[in-house]
């Protein structure tokens, strides 16, 4: 195992809230404010660390992983799976870590929550992430629009069951 996972802490929430991604991925940036810190500390987020205990990313699950436009599109009507979201530290993206990061995060959730079906949504332009999800057994189940900073962004719903 390359990564270890631990509950989100105040310190790590503050660090993650400062992460800034390069365009076009910068729409994944968090705002550094108390509301975001509270969100990261709501119990649905956990940190991922590398083998020398450096914070490398995070996972979230449940309502925290859902995109608002998905409700109107009906993708969250089926409750028999766990919604997940994730993020790698910006300097680690595009370096080939994604496949193992996603696999180990899902394995951790399976172990902790005894869940076997997962759902995630990803911006349709994020081909790097889509490739990683497909490599991890996710299949596309539909598309929908959701507003991000006042702009409609197309998202893809993907499911993994096993």
Stretch-by-stretch model annotation:
Residues 10, 22-91, 112, 161-162:
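Acetyl-CoA-dependent GNAT
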Residues 2-15:
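A short beta-loop-alpha structural element at the N-terminal edge
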Residues 100-117:
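Conserved acyl-CoA
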Residues 115-119, 123-127, 136, 143-162:
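C-terminal "cap" of GNAT-fold acetyltransferases
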Residues 2-4, 83, 117-119:
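Residues at or immediately flanking beta-strands
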Residues 86-103, 124-131, 135:
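Conserved glycine-rich acetyl-CoA-binding loop
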